[in-house]
C-alpha cells in the first residue's frame, strides 16, 4: 500500500517599422495594447460573422494585442473606414465570396490608422464551412505575426487528463484529451478505467505523447502515437515510474524512477533506442523533470533540503550533481522552461498559508513574480512561443478548471471548467507547434 500511496503522491507532487509602431505605450503604469477591429466588407451568410468572432477571441488571448469586431459597417472601400468611431489602431478587413459548391474564398487585408495603403494582404481559397475554426485560427496567426513580429499560437493544441468519478473506489474513468488551444474540437485519444493517466508531455515533432500510468498493478511510462493511437510501454521498473518528458530532439526522455519499492525517486535520462539509463540525481524525492530548450540541462523538483524546491542539473555531467535554483523560493513544484530558455514557470507556494500560484522565475536577475492569484493553481505548461501559460485552477469547492494566463500575468482566460466535484481536470501539456 505504501508504494501505491507514494506513486500517487508523485503524480500530485507533480517588418521592422511596423513592429516599431506597435511598441506598447506605457501610461501611468498601464500597458496600452494596440486595438484591432475585425470587420467584413460583405456579409454573405453567418459564416463571416462566425469566423470573425473566433479571430477576435484569438487576438484577445494574448499579451500584445486587444481586439473587437463590429457588424455595423459593410465597408466597400478602405477609404470609408470610420476610424474615429472605431477608435482602432488597426483594422482587419475580411471579404467573403461563396462559390457554387458552398465553399468560400476569403480575402484579408490589414490596415493601419492614418495610412492609405494596405499593410498586408492574403487570400484563402476554397474553404469548406467545416474548417471555420481552422480558417479563423490561420487568419489570427497571420495577423498576430504581422502586427507583433511573433509567431501566433492559435493553431496549437492542448493535451490534458479528465477524470470522472475521481473519488470512487471503482469505476474511475481517465481520459486523455487533445483540444485546440482554446478548448474547442476535443478528441479523446486514450481512455482507461481505474488505471490513472498522468503527466502527459508532447514530443517536439508533435507526433507522440509520453505519459505515466498504472497497468496490471504496476506503474510504467508509455508513449502514445497520436495519428494511430498505438500505445507502447517503455519502462517496467519496480516501484515508481513517473513524470516523463521528451528531450528536444525526441531521442531521450527524462523521468523519475524509484527502481524498487522506496519512497525516494531519482531523475534519469533514458535513451529511447537502447533503453540505457543515465542517473541525474542521488537523494531525496526528485520528480517532474523538464529539459531546457537546448537540451543541455534539466530542471526538476526535489525535497532534498527538507521542502520541495527547484533544482537544475546538467545532462552532460559525469556524475550526478545539481544545484538549487534560488534560495528566495519557499516551496516550488512542476518547473517548465520558457521556449527561449530565459525563464522558468512553476507552481509556487510562497508561505505556509499562501496556497499555490503560478509564478515566473527570471533566470537573468533571479526575480520571482506570481502571475496568478488563486489559492490552488498548479500544473503550468508554456505555449510554444512563450506568450501564454495554461494551468489548472481549483476553487474552494474542489472544482477544477483549465485556465490560461499571459506570461506577464495581465490576461486571464478560462478554457474549460469542471462544473461539479465529480470531474477533475489535470495535467495540461501545450503542443510544441502549430498544426
Curated annotation (Swiss-Prot):
Pfam hit, one: PD40
Record GO cellular component, one term: periplasmic space
The keyword Cell division appears for this protein: yes
InterPro entries, sorted: 6-blade_b-propeller_TolB-like, PD40, Tol-Pal_TolB
Top-level division of the source organism's lineage: Bacteria
UniProt xrefs under Gene3D superfamilies: TolB, C-terminal domain (2.120.10.30), TolB, N-terminal domain (3.40.50.10070)
Methyltransferase recorded as keyword: no
Keywords: Cell cycle, Cell division, Periplasm, Signal
One Gene Ontology biological process: cell division
Location of the protein in the cell: Periplasm
Signal peptide (from-to): 1-20
Summary of the function given for this chain in its UniProt record: Part of the Tol-Pal system, which plays a role in outer membrane invagination during cell division and is important for maintaining outer membrane integrity.
Similarity comment: family membership: Belongs to the TolB family.
HAMAP family recorded: TolB (MF_00671)
Oligomer status and interactors: The Tol-Pal system is composed of five core proteins: the inner membrane proteins TolA, TolQ and TolR, the periplasmic protein TolB and the outer membrane protein Pal. They form a network linking the inner and outer membranes and the peptidoglycan layer.
Name of the protein: Tol-Pal system protein TolB
The species this protein was found in: Francisella tularensis subsp. novicida (strain U112)
Organism lineage: Bacteria, Pseudomonadati, Pseudomonadota, Gammaproteobacteria, Thiotrichales
Amino acid at each position: 500500500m505504501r508504494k501505491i500511496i507514494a506513486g500517487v503522491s508523485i503524480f500530485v507532487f507533480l517588418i521592422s517599422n511596423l513592429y516599431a509602431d506597435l511598441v506598447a505605450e506605457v501610461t501611468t503604469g498601464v500597458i496600452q495594447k494596440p486595438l484591432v477591429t475585425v470587420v467584413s466588407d460583405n456579409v454573405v451568410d453567418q459564416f463571416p460573422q462566425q469566423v470573425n468572432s473566433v479571430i477576435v477571441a484569438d487576438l484577445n488571448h494574448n499579451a500584445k494585442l486587444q481586439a473587437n469586431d463590429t457588424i455595423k459597417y459593410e465597408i466597400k472601400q478602405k477609404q470609408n473606414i470610420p476610424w474615429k468611431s472605431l477608435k482602432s489602431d488597426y483594422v482587419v478587413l475580411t471579404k467573403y465570396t461563396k462559390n457554387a459548391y458552398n465553399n468560400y474564398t476569403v480575402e484579408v487585408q490589414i490596415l493601419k490608422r492614418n495610412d492609405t495603403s494596405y499593410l498586408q494582404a492574403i487570400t484563402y481559397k476554397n474553404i469548406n464551412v467545416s474548417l471555420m475554426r481552422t480558417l479563423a485560427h490561420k487568419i489570427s496567426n497571420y495577423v498576430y505575426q504581422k502586427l507583433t513580429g511573433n509567431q501566433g499560437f492559435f493553431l496549437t493544441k492542448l493535451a490534458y487528463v479528465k477524470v470522472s468519478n475521481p473519488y470512487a473506489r471503482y469505476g474511475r474513468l481517465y481520459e486523455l484529451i487533445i483540444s485546440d488551444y482554446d478548448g474547442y474540437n476535443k478528441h479523446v485519444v486514450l481512455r482507461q478505467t481505474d488505471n490513472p493517466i498522468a503527466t502527459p508531455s508532447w514530443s517536439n515533432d508533435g507526433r507522440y505523447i509520453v505519459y505515466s500510468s498504472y497497468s496490471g498493478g504496476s506503474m510504467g511510462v508509455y508513449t502514445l502515437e497520436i495519428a494511430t493511437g498505438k500505445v507502447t510501454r517503455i519502462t517496467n521498473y519496480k516501484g515508481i515510474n513517473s513524470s516523463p518528458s521528451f528531450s528536444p530532439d525526441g531521442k531521450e526522455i527524462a523521468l523519475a524512477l524509484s527502481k524498487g519499492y522506496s519512497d525516494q525517486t531519482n531523475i534519469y535520462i533514458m535513451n529511447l533506442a537502447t533503453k540505457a539509463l543515465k542517473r541525474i540525481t542521488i537523494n531525496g524525492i526528485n520528480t517532474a523533470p523538464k529539459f531546457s530548450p537546448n537540451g543541455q540541462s534539466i530542471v526538476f523538483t526535489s525535497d532534498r533540503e527538507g521542502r520541495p524546491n527547484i533544482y537544475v542539473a546538467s545532462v552532460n555531467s559525469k556524475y550526478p550533481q545539481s544545484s538549487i535554483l534560488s534560495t528566495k523560493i519557499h516551496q516550488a513544484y512542476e518547473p517548465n522552461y520558457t521556449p527561449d530558455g530565459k525563464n522558468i514557470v512553476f507552481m509556487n507556494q510562497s508561505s505556509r498559508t499562501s496556497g499555490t500560484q503560478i509564478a515566473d522565475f527570471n533566470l537573468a536577475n533571479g526575480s520571482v513574480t506570481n502571475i496568478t492569484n488563486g489559492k490552488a493553481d498548479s500544473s503550468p505548461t508554456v505555449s510554444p512561443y512563450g506568450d501564454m501559460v495554461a494551468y489548472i485552477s481549483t476553487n474552494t469547492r474542489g472544482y477544477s478548471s483549465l485556465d490560461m494566463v499571459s506570461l506577464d500575468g495581465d490576461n486571464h482566460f478560462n478554457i474549460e471548467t469542471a462544473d461539479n466535484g465529480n470531474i477533475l481536470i489535470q495535467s495540461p501539456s501545450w503542443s510544441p507547434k502549430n498544426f
